[in-house]
Amino acid sequence: MSLLDTLQRGLADLDAQGLRRVRRIAYTACDAHMTVNGREIVGFASNDYLGLAAHPALVAAFAEGAQRYGSGSGGSHLLGGHSRAHARLEDELAGFAGGFSDAPRALYFSTGYMANLAAMTALAGKGATIFSDALNHASLIDGMRLSRANVQVYPHADTAALAALLDASAAETKLIVSDTVFSMDGDIAPLTELVALAERHGAWLVVDDAHGFGVLGPQGRGALAAAALRSPHLVYVGTLGKAAGVAGAFVIAHETVIEWLIQRARSYIFTTAAPPAVAHAVSASLKVIAGDEGDARRAHLAALIERTRALLRNTRWQPVDSHTAVQPLVIGSNDATLAAMRALDAHGLWVPAIRPPTVPAGTSRLRVSLSAAHSFDDLARLEAALIEASEAAAASVGAARQEAAA
């Protein structure tokens, strides 16, 4: 069988299981109201939590950065591509989100995936043991696999199980690794307990705050700041394409850790640096996030979250108990979840269907992603469409059962 035959068979299998992904094309800027596939829609799909992706100040900064630094960096960070914009941003990030450390330093990456690969592969290797939450992001998991470290997975957020694994470990280097906000459930890791376990067992704690940075904590400084946590053995990863509204990611840690990443992190060394204009725009984003406007946007988002929690309980499906901008609604089967997504699409609402392998089999769900750009009128439209779709689904199931029993 040829490679193409094998791939065609694989695609057919995905179709049969309701697992093939399809891209949609956005014709306008990322916002609550967009033109997608030629239609006007209200989007509940993006991670633009503060509604900054189309913010005029960020757009202007991006254009200014391009005028000043050009359209590309021209090389890797170690071979000519590290601009003043990158260096300034790293200093700003360390000052903004590095309050957990006495000697914080930041390192900017082109993507969150690359930042997580760097942290896993450069800080752990043969002889090290990584203790990983069962629901960690795929980029962390891939980094662990590449690290060649021993990996022990503990049940989601189960600190007792983690403590038992740490007690039994004789590894010289131990890394506890966890998302802060879990991207498909919206719950927050038990960070206080994780820090305590790390310190008790001489381990380091690596946290991925992709969905918390900019939203959680005072001035949006992140999940560690929200929990008022400090420790010399913390490594903090954040992303800049979600709440920050631009692109890229960063690692903040003790300056020695960051210097080691510069020397040994392959996903930092062997890639072209992001355009300086991107870093310039992120600097503008940090000013908005930390200012009065950022506070107002976070307050509005918090109100939207509480309203959404209430409206999801009015459907026939199972909401996940989330207090973050990620509001999942578990339906179960792939086909039923896709049908629900299509029903919402007919109402001009884009709510993505999340299916395996992103979530466990049998827990396919709609993932409602909220933004400060949404209005309460947008939520009213969502509620009406969800109730209609869930009632129709329940009626269809009931009719099928009656037919089977006849």
Swiss-Prot record:
Keyword Iron-sulfur: no
Record's keyword terms, sorted: Biotin biosynthesis, Pyridoxal phosphate, Transferase
InterPro entries in the cross-refs: Aminotransferase_I/II_large (IPR004839), AON_synthase_class-II (IPR050087), AONS_Archaea/Proteobacteria (IPR004723), AONS_Proteobacteria (IPR022834), PyrdxlP-dep_Trfase (IPR015424), PyrdxlP-dep_Trfase_major (IPR015421), PyrdxlP-dep_Trfase_small (IPR015422)
CC cofactor: pyridoxal 5'-phosphate
Binding site for substrate: 21, 137, 358
Superkingdom in the source lineage: Bacteria
The EC number(s) this enzyme carries: 2.3.1.47
Positions contributing to pyridoxal 5'-phosphate binding: 112-113, 183, 211, 239
Pathway: Cofactor biosynthesis; biotin biosynthesis
The reaction(s) this protein catalyses: 6-carboxyhexanoyl-[ACP] + L-alanine + H(+) = (8S)-8-amino-7-oxononanoate + holo-[ACP] + CO2
GO biological process terms held by the UniProt record: biotin biosynthetic process
NADP in keyword set: no
GO molecular function list: 8-amino-7-oxononanoate synthase activity; pyridoxal phosphate binding
N6-(pyridoxal phosphate)lysine found at: 242
Segments forming a coiled coil: none
Function: Catalyzes the decarboxylative condensation of pimeloyl-[acyl-carrier protein] and L-alanine to produce 8-amino-7-oxononanoate (AON), [acyl-carrier protein], and carbon dioxide.
Similarity comment text for this entry: Belongs to the class-II pyridoxal-phosphate-dependent aminotransferase family. BioF subfamily.
NCBIfam families, alphabetized: bioF
PANTHER family, sorted: 8-AMINO-7-OXONONANOATE SYNTHASE, CLASS II AMINOTRANSFERASE/8-AMINO-7-OXONONANOATE SYNTHASE
Subunit organization: Homodimer.
Protein name: 8-amino-7-oxononanoate synthase
Biological source species: Burkholderia orbicola (strain MC0-3)
Taxonomic lineage of the native organism: Bacteria, Pseudomonadati, Pseudomonadota, Betaproteobacteria, Burkholderiales
